[in-house]
Amino acid sequence: DRSPSRGLGDVYKRQLLLTHAPEYGKNGILVMGDVAVTPVPDASQLAQIAVCTARTAQAVAGIDPKVALLSFSTKGSAKHEVVDKVVEALKIAKEMAPDIAIDGELQADAALVPEVGASKAPGSAIAGNANVLVVPSLEVGNISYKLVQRLGHADAVGPILQGIARPVNDLSRGCSVDDIYKMVAIACNQSIGLKSAK
């Protein structure tokens, strides 16, 4: 059943990144979204992506999500309509899921590096501690995860679909046998999660 799941209007894809940098994310594990579906999300869609990606981090990777809405600006350091969209998405996401730790707008270094986060976004519980990265567009997401995968030698597992009533996932045409194995394991995990939720 590829129909949307209840409460969600759209389908999004996120990438599980297993990096060799344990100082980032949860022991090197990061979840990034949306990397393959929505080219230019509006603020509401970006908020949905943030909430869905956080839920995926919980369900698939066992991560207590610390969500950063990424931008080229940190806490008003730049003014632009794209930044305004991220700020609006943060407000919507906090209303949608007040239980999720989320902040933005944050530059990638402010989201991931504690010293930079403390300098650029003092007082933020997410800055320097993010393990879920929400990018402002598909272009940014797709380029970012592939750069991390290829230049950083990270394992990129996914894309993992969310917002669908049953587990359905996708693989890149450049995937390996190991990638297929990991996606099968994730689909099984998603299926078990659905049965447990009933």
Regions found by a protein language model. Name each.
Residues 5-6, 74-75, 138-141:
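Short glycine-rich anion-binding loops that position phosphate/pyrophosphate groups of nucleotides
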Residues 24-52, 173-197:
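Short, glycine-/small-residue-rich phosphate/pyrophosphate-handling segment
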Residues 27-32, 36-104, 109:
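Glycine-rich phosphate/diphosphate-binding loop of Rossmann-like nucleotide-binding domains
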Residues 1-12:
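Single conserved hydrophobic/aromatic residue that forms the stacking wall/gate
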Residues 14-28, 107, 161-176:
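Short, flexible loop segments at boundaries between secondary-structure elements
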Residues 125, 140, 145-198:
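Internal helix-turn-beta structural module
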Residues 75-89, 113-125, 130:
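Short glycine/threonine-rich loop-to-helix capping motif typified by GTGT followed
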